[in-house]
A protein has these predicted regions:
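Vicinal oxygen chelate
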Residues: 19-72, 80-108, 116-122
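Helix N-cap motif at beta-to-alpha junctions
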Residues: 5-6, 74-77
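Conserved active-site tyrosine of GNAT-family acetyltransferases
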Residues: 8-13, 83, 110
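Conserved beta-strand-loop-alpha-helix junction that forms the acyl-donor binding cleft
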Residues: 2-5, 26-28
Length: 122
């Protein structure tokens, strides 16, 4: 969930280089906004604007502080440098795990993402 379509769209497209897949006005207050990461033809993200106080209270903590979004890359160094260049908050620096190289980043609302370059054989 997002506070504002415009600010969320700007963050994901300008800082993470996502592209717009669909933007349909459903009502004066509601849009169907779908974005996708670079090379993410099989993956997309719906930007759903919080509509109630309860929903707004959960923005940025929809999973109780756990990582729940995973951004796969074929070039970890390039994409990690982009995160740094865009001044995106890194909450856990890169580490090499048995399954690949991973760092944890925070989006504009505090949601946690893994940037991960999986090991091909894993």
């Amino acid at each position: 969930m997002v506070n504002d379509y415009k600010e969320a769209f700007a963050f994901y497209t300008q800082k993470l280089h996502f592209t717009l897949v669909e933007d349909t006005q459903l009502s004066p207050e509601k849009r169907w906004v779908i974005i996708a990461p670079p090379g993410g033809e099989a993956c997309s993200l719906l930007l759903a604007k919080a509509a109630t106080d309860e929903q707004r209270s959960r923005i940025g903590n929809q999973t109780g502080g756990r990582v729940f979004l995973f951004l796969h890359t074929d070039n970890f160094e390039r994409d990690y440098k982009n995160l740094q260049d865009q001044q995106i908050k890194i909450t856990r620096p890169p580490v090499t795990e048995p399954y690949g190289t991973v760092a944890v980043l925070e989006d504009l609302y505090g949601n946690l993402w893994d940037l991960i370059q999986p090991i091909k054989s894993f």
